Structures are given as C-alpha cells and as structure tokens.
Amino acid sequence: LGNEENGRWSLRPSDEITRARRRYRDDTLILETELSCEKGVVRLIDFMPPRGEAPDVVRIVEGVEGTVPVKMSLSIRFDYGSIVPWVRRRKQGLLAIAGPDALFLATPVELVGRNLHTVADFEVSEGDRVPFVLTWYPSNRPPPERTDAEEALEDTASFWREWVTDCAHTGRFREPLVRSLITLKAL
C-alpha cells in the first residue's frame, strides 16, 4: 500500500544484513525478528498490547551478540498516507498531531527530524534492550499514561497464552490451529 512516503517505521542494523529470521513466540502474537550483520545480532520484538483505551505498537531492540549500530526511521502519515503531521520533540520522545489524530513515540533514544522523517542512530550490545512505544490517541484529549514496554511484553504474552488455553485440541495440528485462532482473534 503505497511507499515509504505514505508512512513507514524501520528499525534495522546500520550495516548490511546477512541473515534474517522471524518467528512468533509460542502461543502469542509477539513477533521476533533476528537480524545478523558483520558486527553481531539484534532481535526486534514487535507487538500490540491488548488494551482498549489507546492502541500501542511496541518495538524492543535487543542486543543478542556483539555491538551493533542500529538505525531507526519513522515516517508518520495519517489519512492513508496523505497527511504529514505537525511533529514536536518531547521529553524522551516526540508528539505528532494531524487533525483529530495524535501519536506519541516514547523512547530513551535521541530522535532527530530530517526531511519530514524522524531518525535515530544508536548502538546495542549483548543484553541491551531499547524500547520504542508508539501510542495513538485523539488529539483533543491529553496523552494517555505511558506504556512500560517490558511490562507490556509480559502482559501481552500472558494474555495470549491464557487465551489459547481454551483450545482443547492436542493433536498434531495444534500449532497451526492455534496460530490461525490467534490471527482471527487479532482481526
């Protein structure tokens, strides 16, 4: 649907990626992507916590091996990519507003505006975890309480694992059945 000018959020090693592997954590809708490059390996953990008041997209960059330079690029667009929002820096993040919509990106990483995009360059070493939490809310209301990425990760995993306990099937097709059920529930 469109191109990066219509909106995009990229997190990746600055160096050339030599290997990429993706998987969902067992019985969850938490996506893990391992990206390898010459300097090491990073894991991206992507999910949406199941909370009703303000939808979040949470991304955690985890250092798995070595010290890896990472680049982030965020192009926020509303109305199917046709509206570029007004963007302001805030303490540990940024605020983007366009008409009735607002987004807050919370992260400890320093963010810079460049050519109508938000970018960041940082490094992660083995054991480091760098969170990014993007939250939507109506622009005529105050921002919702910030989501703690690590707490949201635990809560999201618990939510999905508890939800799939209702699936009584234990046969050889349990895994694809559960994956299908989770996908349908997410819709």
PLM-predicted stretches and their roles:
Residues 1-187:
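Acidic, mature catalytic/reactive cores of soluble proteins
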